[in-house]
Amino acid sequence: MVSFDATEALAPYREGRGYGAIVFDRERLRQADASLFSPQSWGDRARPVDKGGRGGAWFVDAPFGRSVLRQYLRGGMAARVSRDRYLWKGAGRTRSFAEFRLMRELIKRKLPVPRPLAACYLREGLGYRAALLMERLENVRSLADHAQLAGRGAPWEATGQLIARFHRAGLDHPDLNAHNILFDAGGHGWLIDFDRGVLRIPATRWRERNLKRLHRSLLKLRGNRSGEDVDKDYERLHRAYELAWGRGY
């Protein structure tokens, strides 16, 4: 359940034959329009993010701070039908608005996530396109990078503890992979990419599903490391997770 947030503002807009809306953090942005979500409008202040995901993301040097712009893109078989259009089910169920509000709720619960700044959708007929703008985390490296560079020295225990903390709050992260777990040089961790995420009553089934998803991604991204080495590292992560879960944090 995502609670009401009085600092959230809403602005309708039109573009061509479509119509949509922008939700934004009015403590960070005085106003918002569609240009926020166009990398072309940022010119040389926007540059593509080249690691992880399906593309469609840019680092943006904005007046309100260094940010990340992400356009929602489909993968797999669905991308053959449309790369960037989703079936309209109502404004509150758009991918962008749902993720924006979920991230704000996680921040209220004192969890380490990037601060969302604005989200939009543009509806045309039965479909819509969407985008999200959020603050950029500085000087961080993904668990995927740590695993490639440090192997056994990567922050496996810290990762398990971090995931347990989010699970204790009820976050079901359907795309928990090694690119979506970040650490800075001081060992502080964050989770990112909450598309299709949801808050649930903590239960073993969905928690284990998240962890299995992470395990598969570690095996996929192992590079020259053996599957046996990856499994041993994952066991360290899982043990730390279970200990943290048992302690209640």
UniProtKB/Swiss-Prot annotation:
GO cellular component: plasma membrane
Entry keyword Isomerase: no
Matches recorded under InterPro entries: KDO_kinase, Kinase-like_dom_sf
Highest taxon in the source lineage: Bacteria
Pathway linked to the protein: Bacterial outer membrane biogenesis; LPS core biosynthesis
Reaction(s) this enzyme catalyzes, per UniProt: an alpha-Kdo-(2->6)-lipid IVA + ATP = a 4-O-phospho-alpha-Kdo-(2->6)-lipid IVA + ADP + H(+)
UniProt key word Nucleotide-binding: yes
Gene Ontology molecular functions: ATP binding; kinase activity; phosphotransferase activity, alcohol group as acceptor
Gene Ontology BP, a term: lipopolysaccharide core region biosynthetic process
EC number(s) stated in the UniProt entry for this protein: 2.7.1.166
Keyword terms of this UniProt record: ATP-binding, Cell inner membrane, Cell membrane, Kinase, Lipopolysaccharide biosynthesis, Membrane, Nucleotide-binding, Transferase
Enzyme class, spelled out: transferase
Active site (record annotation): D175
Location within or outside the cell: Cell inner membrane
Membrane topology: Peripheral membrane protein
Family listed: Belongs to the protein kinase superfamily. KdkA/RfaP family.
Function recorded in the entry: Catalyzes the ATP-dependent phosphorylation of the 3-deoxy-D-manno-octulosonic acid (Kdo) residue in Kdo-lipid IV(A) at the 4-OH position.
This protein's name: 3-deoxy-D-manno-octulosonic acid kinase
